[in-house]
Amino acid sequence: MRRVVSILLILSFGFVFVFPQTKQKPVSQFENVEPFSIGKGSSFSASVPRSNSDSSQTQAIPNGNISQDFSDALEFIRKNHVDGKNVNYNELTKSAIDSMLHTLDPHSNYFDADEYQDLLTDEQSEYYGIGATIANYQKGNETNTFIVATFPDSPAFRAGLRYGDKILAVNGETMADKNSSFVRDKVRGKKGSVVRLLVERAATKRQDTVDLKRNRVPQPTIPDAYIIREGIGYIDMSEGFNYTTAEELTVALSELHKQGMTSLILDLRENPGGILDQAVKVAEKFLPSGSTILSQRGRFSIDNRVWRSTNKTAETMPLAVLVNGSTASASEIVSGALQDYDRALVIGENTFGKGLVQSIIDLPYGSGLTLTTAKYYTPSGRSIQRDYSKSGLYDYFNHKVSLSEQNKTEAKTLTGRKVFGGDGITPDEIVTNSPLTNTQAKLLDPIFFFSSELANGNIQGFESYKIGGQIQYGKRIRPSDYPVTDEILKAFNNFLVQNGDWKSLSSNIEAENAFIKTRIRYNLITAAFGTVSANQVLIEEDKQMAKAVEV
């Protein structure tokens, strides 16, 4: 079965800005559209079902014997390769299909049955697990997986798992030196089933066996929304677009209006895309009825579509949109349309640049295929897809290749400003947040372990920083919440010196003073109030956010 998706955007002026359109009849996003995803990498959009028996469009596949060649080669490998008895032939076949698809473009992909199920689970905005954020940290030669945070009222929270607890085993299988994604997959399972964890408590170093019943774990796409300065609202939309995004945005806007919001910062950084129908509804919040949001053009006429807003009460307040290199696909549609209509000031770094639409094909035995079947364009006619013809997958996904200015396609916004296509969305205000230096990256491990000791009252002289009682999820933090003083910085330096593997890092304390203080406080706030509140700490040091507040 094949499926496809669509998109729309809205404007905050008293008239409609109509760009040249393709001649096909516009399609409302509310008419029989089965939403799926458009996203970065292995996310995509869905498509209207189309018959596979359209013989008028079908051509004979050249080299008809190639499939027999492949079968013969596989059999020859099985019989003759030195490791033939140990080869995973499913993986071998999967890699062959992937290579074939990636010859076409970077976003056509094959998913085996497990991967396909994970994909569908992610799109439903929920999974069955224990409700905890986990991460890998290294001390000495050992890498282990630790609890970083738990979700409100989740199985992990009710079982008393807390910041810094180490996961030693899952259902009797050791997790030492395992990647956190491997541990996550072991912890997840069928709803209502029981998973047994062996954990080492951060506070006491005691080992406990904990049985947790897996349950539905909601994954909101708007983890936070609050007044960042008087009159200025902030909405974090970093988690993509799923089936609940538009409803979440409606609730967030309503609450912020009640708190006196007169302007808004919409944060699309790190947003990988998602369900197109939801991205359309997000854009419609800010663009008026009749505004073209997106056009889609494909090989077949059925893939040619146009989406327009139907919102007659669009928001009219000043709007800033934050983007970066991980703002991809459906989130680029939102930011691109708002920019084309001069409805929002786009701030940050060039976006990812994914303008291809994938259709999903259900294959036998539970696997799935995504195939690029169309390209999408912003209201001004821009394609934001980056060139992939001269680069490999690594260079493409790591932004090693970009278009020169003279090769970008020029378009104009509603007020006549020049904008360019072919390399993502270029912000109106380019502001770059500095990436972690090598030294800062090396400091993350000891900062985590020190923070865990501090939060559990194990750092002498700083017992008052011990975090006890229930986690106060979603608290608006104040400067008085877990301030990191120079005395704590000295204690951290002693911690480095006493742990031989990190001793050499102590020479960087003075140069990295601000970074270390921010990260320790971030960890303490995470332990006390959860990750949503902790993100407020990082925002205080955010250059892009500062620019958005300024303008």
What residues fall within each predicted segment?
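Extended, small/polar residue-biased N-terminal targeting/export presequences
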Residues: 78-145, 194-224, 538-549
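Positively charged n-region of N-terminal signal peptides that target proteins for export
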Residues: 1-4
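Conserved functional hotspot residues or short segments at active or partner-binding sites
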Residues: 383-384, 388-551
